[in-house]
């Protein structure tokens, strides 16, 4: 197994241009596919998740042209639903942002589609989405365990009408349903059961749908109305914002060991909720400066916080490791959906924090972290989870440094992360 040793870093300073958002990249690729006209996407993320989406779209007959560095994609829309005369089997790796939306989109047309993935994907729930699609007439069959991939879709289109969907596990299910609703045969009324998690991710979806010409009536995130007869129309060009979750590591670095770190590609005009991560750093004592398309973090002594971070679940992971450098006990609350991500992130985070000496209480939907008097060096397991690897790079700011196992797992969203991280040192 490959390992990366990060030696102690005294101070960080510099500027990082954040690669494109995974969430926006895969949403925009699917909407561009369903839209009428050709769309040019710039600052597209070049990563495993996006490659799985692009490979699947190509297999389904979608024509696109990629730039040499894979960050500009010119895609010819189908002007409607995806259909196939022959049965198709699509492998989606561990890409939830491809599996969930494609599962929904493929019910709209005609054909037989089987969706598979890596072993971890078979442990990531999709039942709430499938239940909702079945209410609209979809024929979906699980091939192994009920509620989980792999699955086969026998597509004949979706009817309109009222549909209930659970909102308390993952916002990706609602996102997938929203994106396909305009192409159903009738108007769709979506009723959300339970408290909707990760609402800012729904805001991303609604903003992109509007960019492609579709209007959704949002009744305080409890009910959504999508009137029949709407069509996606290409806006011509779509600029993919930098990934706000990826920005969190560099902002935390600035807060812990700045110096001054500036991230560009996200800022006060961002449609991503994870930019609110900077507000949490500010509450902890960091000096934060906002621009329209940049954020600057400067270091100071950090103090612990006790906060509900349901609205920034991915970026909240970075607070867990930043907490090792804060005075007091930090509590991150309402994060049950960490458990259904690339790994069970609550269990993984607790295990690895204890390795470096932290006192950790792992609850069902919270984590409580008290830093040790002296941080220990350790070998950090990453669980094939890109965010575990990037979060624990913060331990380079301890006096002992840290070893990261399987550092290449960052290829899911940020293949050259450690190279960029190293560029801030000195």
From Swiss-Prot:
Gene Ontology MF terms: 3-phosphoshikimate 1-carboxyvinyltransferase activity
GO biological process, one term: aromatic amino acid family biosynthetic process
SUPFAM superfamilies according to UniProt: EPT/RTPC-like
Stored Gene3D superfamilies: Enolpyruvate transferase domain (3.65.10.10)
A GO cellular component annotation in the UniProt record: cytoplasm
Active site: residue positions: 314
Recorded catalytic activity of this chain's protein: 3-phosphoshikimate + phosphoenolpyruvate = 5-O-(1-carboxyvinyl)-3-phosphoshikimate + phosphate
Keyword Amino-acid biosynthesis: yes
Keyword hit for Cytoplasm: yes
EC number: 2.5.1.19
InterPro entries: Enolpyruvate_Tfrase_dom, Enolpyruvate_Tfrase_sf, EPSP_synthase, EPSP_synthase_CS, RNA3'P_cycl/enolpyr_Trfase_a/b
Entry binding sites for phosphoenolpyruvate: 22, 96, 124, 172, 345, 387, 412
PROSITE patterns reported for this sequence: EPSP_SYNTHASE_1, EPSP_SYNTHASE_2
Cellular compartment(s): Cytoplasm
Parts of the chain that traverse the membrane: none
Pathway(s) per entry: Metabolic intermediate biosynthesis; chorismate biosynthesis; chorismate from D-erythrose 4-phosphate and phosphoenolpyruvate: step 6/7
Annotated residues for binding of 3-phosphoshikimate: 22-23, 27, 170-172, 198, 314, 337, 341
Keyword set, alphabetical order: Amino-acid biosynthesis, Aromatic amino acid biosynthesis, Cytoplasm, Transferase
Similarity comment: family membership: Belongs to the EPSP synthase family.
NCBIfam families on file: aroA
Purpose of the protein: Catalyzes the transfer of the enolpyruvyl moiety of phosphoenolpyruvate (PEP) to the 5-hydroxyl of shikimate-3-phosphate (S3P) to produce enolpyruvyl shikimate-3-phosphate and inorganic phosphate.
SUBUNIT field: Monomer.
Protein name in the entry: 3-phosphoshikimate 1-carboxyvinyltransferase
Organism of origin: Shewanella baltica (strain OS155 / ATCC BAA-1091)
Gene name of the record: aroA
């Amino acid at each position: 197994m490959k390992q990366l040793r990060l030696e102690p870093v005294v101070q960080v300073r510099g500027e990082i241009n954040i690669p494109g958002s995974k969430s926006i990249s895969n949403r925009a690729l699917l909407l561009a596919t369903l839209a009428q006209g050709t769309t040019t996407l710039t600052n597209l993320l070049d990563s495993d998740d996006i490659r799985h989406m692009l490979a699947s779209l190509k297999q389904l007959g979608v024509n696109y042209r990629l730039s040499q560095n894979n960050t500009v994609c010119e895609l010819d829309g189908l002007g409607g639903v995806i259909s196939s005369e022959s049965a198709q089997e699509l492998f989606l790796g561990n890409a939830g942002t491809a599996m969930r939306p494609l599962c929904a989109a493929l019910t709209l047309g005609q054909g037989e589609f089987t969706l598979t993935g890596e072993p971890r994907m078979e442990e990531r729930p999709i039942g709430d989405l499938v239940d909702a699609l079945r209410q609209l007439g979809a024929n979906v069959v699980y091939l192994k365990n009920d509620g989980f991939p792999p699955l086969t879709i026998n597509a004949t289109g979706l009817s309109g009408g009222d549909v209930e969907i659970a909102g308390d596990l993952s916002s990706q299910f609602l996102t997938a349903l929203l994106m396909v609703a305009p192409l159903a045969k009738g108007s769709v009324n979506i009723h959300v059961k339970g408290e909707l998690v990760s609402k800012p991710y729904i805001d991303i979806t609604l903003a992109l749908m509007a960019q492609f010409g579709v209007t959704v009536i949002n009744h305080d995130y409890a009910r959504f109305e999508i009137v029949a007869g709407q069509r996606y129309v290409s806006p011509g060009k779509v600029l993919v914002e930098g990934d706000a979750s990826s920005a969190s590591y560099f902002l935390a670095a600035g807060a812990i060991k700045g110096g001054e770190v500036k991230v560009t590609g996200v800022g006060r005009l961002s449609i991503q909720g994870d930019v609110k991560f900077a507000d949490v750093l500010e509450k902890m004592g960091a000096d934060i400066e906002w621009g329209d398309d940049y954020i600057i973090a400067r270091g100071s002594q950090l103090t612990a916080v006790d906060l509900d971070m349901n609205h920034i679940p991915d970026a909240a992971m970075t607070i867990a490791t930043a907490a090792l450098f804060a005075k007091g006990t930090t509590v991150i609350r309402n994060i049950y959906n960490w458990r259904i991500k690339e790994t069970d992130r609550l269990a993984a985070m607790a295990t690895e924090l204890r390795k470096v000496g932290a006192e950790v209480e792992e609850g069902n939907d919270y984590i409580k972290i008290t830093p040790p008097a002296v941080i220990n060096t350790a070998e950090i397991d990453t669980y094939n989870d890109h965010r575990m690897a990037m979060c624990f790079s913060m331990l380079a700011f301890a006096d002992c440094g840290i070893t990261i196992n399987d550092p290449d797992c960052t290829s899911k969203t940020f293949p050259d992360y450690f190279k960029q991280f190293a560029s801030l040192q000195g």
